[in-house]
């Protein structure tokens, strides 16, 4: 992970080191017009999944370079390293439930006691590995399910 500094990678690294922060996504708008997401010109929009509001604001106050506009619906007052109080904006990302229904035809090697739970666990692991704003590709689950002993065919 990057060294905590004013770069995008550094800010992300610093935020990821905070307790409770599970993911961070940063959208930069380096242009003179609002971007396709509605972020103001020359702004940085930080999204955090988890973490405490005050911790995130303090971290951003310390790590974001002077003169940078922070976008976001959360507005928190935080002191920077010099003790100056700054208005810090960011947003929390929202967990979105993902549901999967998979039909499996089994073979004689299928473990009737634990097989279904193992499949559920593998699907949950894939979903939990997704990054914020990532796309869910159902077909990426198939190789994992087919690798389970006793699975003959998979469909949805």
Segments predicted by a language model, with ranges:
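Carbohydrate-recognition loop of C-type lectin domains
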Residues: 2-134
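Short loop/turn elements at secondary-structure junctions
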Residues: 20-21, 134-156
